[in-house]
Amino acid sequence: MADFEELRNMVSSFRVSELQVLLGFAGRNKSGRKHDLLMRALHLLKSGCSPAVQIKIRELYRRRYPRTLEGLCDLSTIKSSVFSLDGSSSPVEPDLPVAGIHSLPSTSITPHSPSSPVGSVLLQDTKPTFEMQQPSPPIPPVHPDVQLKNLPFYDVLDVLIKPTSLVQSSIQRFQEKFFIFALTPQQVREICISRDFLPGGRRDYTVQVQLRLCLAETSCPQEDNYPNSLCIKVNGKLFPLPGYAPPPKNGIEQKRPGRPLNITSLVRLSSAVPNQISISWASEIGKNYSMSVYLVRQLTSAMLLQRLKMKGIRNPDHSRALIKEKLTADPDSEIATTSLRVSLMCPLGKMRLTIPCRAVTCTHLQCFDAALYLQMNEKKPTWICPVCDKKAAYESLILDGLFMEILNDCSDVDEIKFQEDGSWCPMRPKKEAMKVTSQPCTKVESSSVFSKPCSVTVASDASKKKIDVIDLTIESSSDEEEDPPAKRKCIFMSETQSSPTKGVLMYQPSSVRVPSVTSVDPAAIPPSLTDYSVPFHHTPVSSMSSDLPGLDFLSLIPVDPQYCPPMFLDSLTSPLTASSTSVTTTSPHESSTHVSSSSSRSETGVITSSGRNIPDIISLD
């Protein structure tokens, strides 16, 4: 009864392919859906199957869930006992199909004749079996001595599954193999402590469970390499693989870039429950692969840079010896190199070097920045030298001491030149080398910059002999002014600058308004308004133009005896006859001059105003 339950559980765990093989071996219909196939297999088991069918069930189950090396040890024992031509009629051993007939699906064994002698069956099938097994390649070892290349950004903490060969278990194209591993409580604790929650509910781990695949070659350390049609399941969940790389040429099959696989998110973080990995792939002739699982700790570029600095800086004499070797004249060559020009700019970031670095395997002197190189490989690990496009692994990187000295000595140079003796000199740009000499220009400190677009500066007669240059760019760019801005001087108009037309207002708008005070000769004032031949017409106040700003409204009122009574004239001429001097009213924005004479009542004031100091507003108050 226990055997029946065990066989029933084995059949229930079969896939469609195993069910079809079992039903075909028993001579039953093997077409249909999985549910139908499973019901037929269980019915076959309940109806009392033969021992050969039971052996076939155990064989299929052992293929699907391989256990240990005990099966292979039993395999060699069974082979030696089965193929011995002793002619004994002993019954078939339970593991016989595993050894002999698993590669021959169509055998001459009759399932319903368990009492038939096995010797005759073996004698009939011995020859063709050996003919088919002769060209088959030898079985690779289960744990080959495969070494994987070290990954600089990962420290290996423990080995969960040693490198194990992906052995072909049948002649079918697509193969599948299962692996089981368990975590210890300490390993589970380290993984949980390193967990970090990211936005979107995602989780990231610094301590990771890493799966690696490579070719089963023992000649040299192997890089990560995936077989064709790879499919990985961890605890029954499909693991997403990296995308395909673009093919280098047309017609070449696309392959995934080889890199380690972080399966931590699908692993059961428990020491009580084991984890199962299912790997299916397409077999290739002449290529065998192996897999391994590690517990690793992920590092950052800053950590690797610190480790690189701890290795120390290479002696500058090594670089000088390399320079002398490159510049040594070759007697067989007609062309000799006398100097080497090297840039101090990083070819990766196009910036000045901070930590000059290069690989020991490189033959050039040009360095690249170590921090940028590590950051680039942290995102996409290629480890290719940006100068010569050759392999530059992390283990071969060095910090150049000579370039360290050069960067510390000159901070404003981007290129240097090495001489034959190993010395160097900076290479400055031609624009800096050619300095244009010119006469110094004197700067007028008393000048100031105003908010107006134009400024007027009036110099004295002594300063007119010199040619002063005002640098408005320097004045405007300076944030702090040492001296306060000088005040503008008032310009007074002389007698010759006054208007030659008597009694006519001259108005010319100007952007600079300078108050002026003019002295008017009393002889220039007309005795009365009757001296003018032009008849005077009274102009109403509403019709006066607004273009006459800054004028005293009383000076515009006509003083004529025929229009105004004597009492009104007396009130108007009383302030004018008080004195014959000029009264000047100035303000920051307007200036006007009122001149009066005390000759008679009919006399009036003549307004003389410069065109530059007339305001724009007439006050009626």
From Swiss-Prot:
Motif (LXXLL motif): 19-23
Domain PINIT: start-end pairs: 134-299
InterPro entries linked to this entry: PINIT, PINIT_sf, SAP_dom, SAP_dom_sf, Znf_MIZ, Znf_RING/FYVE/PHD
Ranges for domain SAP: 11-45
Motif annotated as Nuclear localization signal, chain positions: 484-492
EC code: 2.3.2.27
Compartments, as annotated in UniProt: Nucleus speckle; Nucleus, PML body; Nucleus
Pfam families attached to this UniProt entry: PINIT (PF14324), SAP (PF02037), zf-MIZ (PF02891)
Mod. after translation: Sumoylated.
GO MF: DNA binding; nuclear androgen receptor binding; RNA polymerase II-specific DNA-binding transcription factor binding; SUMO ligase activity; SUMO transferase activity; ubiquitin protein ligase binding; zinc ion binding
Record region (Disordered): 577-621
Residue ranges covered by zinc fingers (SP-RING-type): 331-412
Low complexity compositional bias, start-end: 577-610
One Gene Ontology biological process: regulation of androgen receptor signaling pathway
Binding, Zn(2+): 362, 364, 385, 388
Subunit structure: Binds SUMO1 and UBE2I. Interacts with AXIN1, JUN, MDM2, PARK7, TP53 and TP73 isoform alpha, but not TP73 isoform beta. Interacts with STAT4 following IL12 and IFN-alpha stimulation of T-cells. Interacts also with GTF2I, GTF2IRD1, IKFZ1, DAB2 and MSX2, as well as with several steroid receptors, including ESR1, ESR2, NR3C1, PGR, AR, and with NCOA2. Sumoylation of a target protein seems to enhance the interaction. Binds to sumoylated ELK1. Interacts with PLAG1. Binds DNA, such as CDKN1A promoter, in a sequence-specific manner.
Family: Belongs to the PIAS family.
Free-text note on domains in this protein's UniProt record: The LXXLL motif is a transcriptional coregulator signature.
PANTHER family per record: E3 SUMO-PROTEIN LIGASE PIAS2, ZINC FINGER MIZ DOMAIN-CONTAINING PROTEIN
The protein's name in its UniProt record: E3 SUMO-protein ligase PIAS2
Source species: Mus musculus (Mouse)
